Every structure is written in C-alpha cells, then in structure tokens.
A protein has these predicted regions:
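Intrinsically disordered, low-complexity
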Residues: 1-55, 136-137
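Compositionally biased, intrinsically disordered low-complexity regions
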Residues: 8, 15, 52, 58-61, ...
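Short, isolated positions in well-ordered beta-strands
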Residues: 43-44, 59, 85
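Short, surface-exposed linear segments at secondary-structure transitions and domain or protein termini
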Residues: 50-60, 94-99
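Exported/periplasmic cell-wall-interacting domains
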Residues: 64-137
Length: 137
C-alpha cells in the first residue's frame, strides 16, 4: 500500500489555528464499546476491531491498494513491519465471518474480531476521508 498524498497530513509544529482545526478533525475509537465517534459532531458508529488493534494517537494517511475487498484504498494509521493497521470499509472476502451482520450487532463481543484493523460502514468511511487524527482508547 502506498500513500495517495505522499505523506501523513497530521504534523507537529503547525500554527495554533492549524492545530485547532486538525484536533477538530479527530475520531476516537473506544475499544471497550467497539465504537467510533467523530469529535466535531459527536456522532458515534459501531465498528469491527480486534484484540491487536493498537491504542494511542495516530495521524491518518490515505493509502491506495489493489488488494481485493478494500475498494481501492484504506486509511492507514500505524505501520508494523509489513502490516499496515488501517481504517477501511467492512472487508467481506470471507462470507463465513459475517462481518456485515457483526458490525450491526448491539453486542460488543460480536464486533471484536479483526486482525487489528478497524472496519467501518461505507458511509462512515467516506466521512473519515476528511479527518486527520485517530485516538484509540
């Protein structure tokens, strides 16, 4: 996977107004609820996560991919060796995993099942393309 823009848009040392805007364009994933919330409008949505989903604060980078099931791109947030932890649309390449059913489940335990990436609905993904910071708690 390669960055579309060439580099992450979140950077240290920016003027205060820029930092304030970047912080407004932040999303928070609460792993205890398997839920993603947008900091600016406080809307929250269920997500699929995994026990390996890393916690912390990360810059978001749009990455193109030709791997099947990702719709051509993912939003990367942490690289570990050859593995990119990313936010992406619900990955449905293994039907028996029932990911669409699981993301709609009210049970948090149903939504903890990925290898560490964060799966979101198509509508949430499109909104995420305009955000800069991810905080996983």
């Amino acid at each position: 996977m390669r960055p579309v823009n060439g580099c992450p848009v979140y950077a240290q040392g920016q003027p205060d107004a820029v930092n304030a805007y970047i912080q407004k364009k932040k999303v928070i994933v609460d792993t205890s609820k398997a839920e993603l919330c947008f900091a600016d409008d406080r809307q929250c949505h269920p997500v699929l996560i995994g026990v390996a989903t890393p916690k912390g604060t990360f810059g978001l980078t749009l990455n193109s991919t030709d791997k099947p099931g990702y719709g051509g791109e993912v939003i990367g947030f942490k690289q570990e060796g050859d593995f990119l932890f990313a936010l992406h649309r619900v990955w449905n390449q293994i039907p028996s995993e029932r990911r669409n059913e699981r993301i709609a489940s009210p049970s948090v335990s149903d939504r903890i099942m990925t290898n560490g990436c964060i799966n979101v609905s198509d509508a949430v993904y499109e909104k995420l393309r305009h955000y800069f910071v991810l905080e996983v708690i």
